[in-house]
Amino acid sequence: IWSESISTTATQLYAMEGKEVRFGEASSALWSALTTQVNNGSVNMMHDSSAPLTGLIALANMLINAIWGGIGCGLQQFIIYLFLAVFIAGLMIGRTPELFGRKIEAGEIKLLAVVILIQPITILTLTAVTLYFPALTGNSNPQYHAVSQVLYEYVSAFANNGSGFEGLADNTIWWNLSTSLALVLGRFPTLIIP
């Protein structure tokens, strides 16, 4: 909310482009933060028009994907964090880590490491491939913000959110297939592996 209320323009006016004027920039930024925490994908502002810090918060919310106890697919991430926290706490107190009467040992932690590494590998690989071939991107902004737009698209697909920075021509075969791959890798390995 703070980042939306300060102006970075020469006119010292609020940047209201892309925001819901009925609610103002503070409520729009709050909704942006909440909608990316609970994986519902609804918007009342264009996230691409938000201030840089507001966009970063939305991106971080989807990367964590376990705020508010992990609603939706975030519940899977929440359970992974729970297993990891129990394992680390068990190591710190010198006991064999247990959760619900079941021991958590090296085998389970190796599987958790695989699940945790799927997120950055999937998102960064798809982002790199998309940016390497500019014809695939369909980006309206060829500058540094293009990286944010592509990264946000894949993070949103992986986190099962559905929002986007929307500077992309993303109704193409490449975007449909690559975001579908990110969506599948965001949902099913966390159900199957642990």
Residue ranges and their predicted role:
Residues 1, 104-119:
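Alpha-helical transmembrane segments and their helix-start/interface "positive-inside/aromatic belt" motifs
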Residues 1-13, 93, 97-98, 127-139:
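Juxtamembrane/interface segments at transmembrane-helix termini
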Residues 5-73, 137-186:
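P-loop potassium selectivity filter motif centered on the GYG triad
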Residues 42-110:
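Long hydrophobic segments that form regular secondary structure
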Residues 119-126, 186-190:
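Alpha-helical transmembrane segments of multipass membrane proteins
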Residues 130-133, 190-194:
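Membrane-helix cytosolic exit motif
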